[in-house]
Design a protein with these regions (language model features):
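N-terminal secretory signal peptides that target proteins for export/translocation
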Residues: 1-4
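C-terminal alpha-helical interaction module
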Residues: 513-514
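Extracellular, beta-strand-rich glycan-interacting domains
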Residues: 469-471
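Formylglycine-dependent sulfatase
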Residues: 6-8, 15-464, 473-494, 501, ...
Length: 528
């Protein structure tokens, strides 16, 4: 037995999963599945991953799941942006295979996915909340999803009865209330009214904590008067100090959006809570600090509604006598910058956007209060769900089940590295690929749109970044070009090429990418 990355959380000692009494449900060979997915709910704000914001997180129910299940410490996104990440979760494939490269792409209904496989295995399936994949959901017996990415207040829900593809129009019907509450209401109702002769799988997808980070009135005064601690690199103005090779998206852009939404609401895409924002004119340091405080306050209030509604879902399982035989997963589609490097948003292969905070509970099989450090990615999720359901993974799935890892038995051949690729090209955030293992990270910013949708019509000079996460966990010093790491960098370059071949991401049809690779990707060099 290989038990690397597996440990007992001391805080969980003495805590047992809560279950209710007998019900009229039929005996089942395979467990029910409750898959809860949020948007941009980054690990820094969960409270179970440590960090400067951990003491401030409203996380009673996330902490309950952690105490009763297993926390993944190294779950990563393969393309840190909402639409591609969700497609990878469903299909078990990287973007170049499932065809969803950028925010503007759609998942084809005919594409195989885990919901279809669960149906074939005898499951009743439901999808509620944020879909964002533009075409009609396939593989679900019932769905009620937002138009596009949805709104926080009085969102439009679309069902099979009134479906319209996102690019054809809004369709659907407005439902009054706050979106996180409404999604939970619908999920609870579906669970209670389910076909009790079959196992179920419900995908409960929240919009929160996506920008504009709104919150229900019951959390409007949470954190009043609180001054949040700052990340050590909040005051990183530009790349000179760290040696990073791109501009990034600074917090000042968020303040500009707040001002635009307040002064010209009719022509801005969304609203934000608690405007106007009054910055500090003429003092860039004080201004950035003020922006950070508002962003984190809004964000944590928004996140509090997620935790609150996770509690409602867990209580429903208890009341229905389902807790013991239901796999409960809570995960975010990717992480998010909360002022680290002076940034907000995601996309970049830095730790904050790359990490997918993930907790899972299955009392029959997963030891309570454990943590697992194995490298897992979102392309593995579909295979895990298929494994629990006794189903086949989606066709051409590239991931593998980590069920045995969760029980403390990691296969000897389990991957030690993960491969990442962000396809959208922007001047401030160039397209890039990279590799990460348990200590090092290597990123190649190739800086070309390669015909991808949603990209700027620009080219960025190709560049490299390398980080030693053991000595520099916050990625404050780009060590590419440091002779002390030349051997490691060369080995990781070669391994990244091998992973590209393994995952069939070889850009064989792109003469432009071949030119970039031949000119700027020299596996034997750490200086190119």
């Amino acid at each position: 037995m290989d038990t690397r990355g597996f440990k007992i959380c001391a805080a969980a000692v003495g805590i047992l999963p809560v279950t209710a009494g007998c019900t009229d449900q039929a005996p089942q060979e395979h467990p029910n599945i409750l898959f809860i997915l949020s948007d941009d709910h980054t690990s820094q704000s969960w409270g179970i991953y440590g960090g400067i914001l951990a003491p401030y997180a409203a996380n009673d129910n996330i902490a309950r799941l952690a105490a009763e299940g297993c926390v993944l410490d190294n779950a990563f996104c393969t393309n840190s942006i909402s639409v591609p990440s969700r497609a990878a979760i469903l299909t078990g494939q990287y973007s170049h295979l499932n065809g969803v490269y950028t925010l503007d792409d759609a998942l084809r209904p005919e594409q195989d996915n885990i919901a279809k496989r669960l149906q074939q295995a005898g499951y009743r399936t439901a999808l509620i909340g944020k879909w964002h994949l533009k075409k009609e959901p396939a593989g679900f017996d019932y769905y009620s999803v937002f138009h596009d990415q949805g709104t926080y207040r009085d969102p439009v829900f679309k069902t099979a009865e009134n479906w319209m593809d996102d690019d054809k129009g809004v369709g659907g019907a407005v439902e009054k209330g706050f979106s996180t509450d409404l999604v939970t209401d619908k999920a609870i109702r579906w669970i209670k009214e389910r076909d009790r002769t079959k196992p179920f799988s419900v995908f409960c997808h929240f919009k929160a904590t996506h920008e504009p980070c709104d919150f229900p009135e019951r959390f409007a005064h949470l954190y009043d008067g609180v001054k949040f601690p700052e990340p050590e690199n909040l005051l990183e103005f530009g790349p000179a100090k760290s040696g990073r090779t791109f501009a990034g998206q600074p917090l000042e852009t968020m303040a500009w959006r707040w001002n635009k939404a307040y002064t010209d609401p009719e022509n801005w895409w969304t609203y934000y809570p608690e405007l106007p924002f009054c910055g500090v004119e003429g003092d860039s340091v004080a201004n950035r600090r003020a922006i950070y405080q508002k962003l984190v306050r809004d964000y944590l209030r928004c996140a509090a509604a997620i935790d609150d509604n996770i509690g409602r879902l867990l209580r429903t399982l208890d009341e229905e006598g389902l807790a013991e035989n239901t796999v409960v997963i809570y995960v975010s589609d990717q992480g998010y910058f909360l002022g680290e490097h002076g940034f907000f948003d995601k996309r970049i292969m830095y730790e904050e956007p790359l990490r997918m905070p993930f907790v899972i509970r299955y009392p029959k099989e997963i030891p309570a209060g454990t943590r697992n450090g194995d490298i897992v990615t979102n392309v593995d999720f579909a295979s895990l769900l298929a494994d629990y359901a006794g189903a086949e993974p989606p066709q051409q799935a590239q991931g593998r089940s980590f069920r045995s890892n969760l029980a403390g038995d990691t296969p000897q051949e389990w991957p030690r590295s993960m491969y990442y690729r962000y396809w959208t090209q922007h001047e401030i955030r160039p397209a890039h690929m990279g590799i990460r293992n348990d200590r090092y990270k290597l990123i190649f910013f190739y800086g070309d749109r390669l015909g991808m949708t949603g990209s700027d019509d620009c080219v960025s000079p190709p560049s490299w970044e390398f980080y030693d996460l053991e000595t520099d966990p916050h990625e404050n010093r780009n060590q590419y070009g440091n002779p002390a790491y030349a051997e490691v960098i060369g080995a990781m370059k070669r391994e990244m090429l091998e992973l590209r071949r393994q995952y069939k991401d070889t850009d064989e049809g792109s003469a432009r990418m071949r030119e970039i690779m031949e000119t700027h990707y020299a596996p034997e060099s750490a200086k190119h």
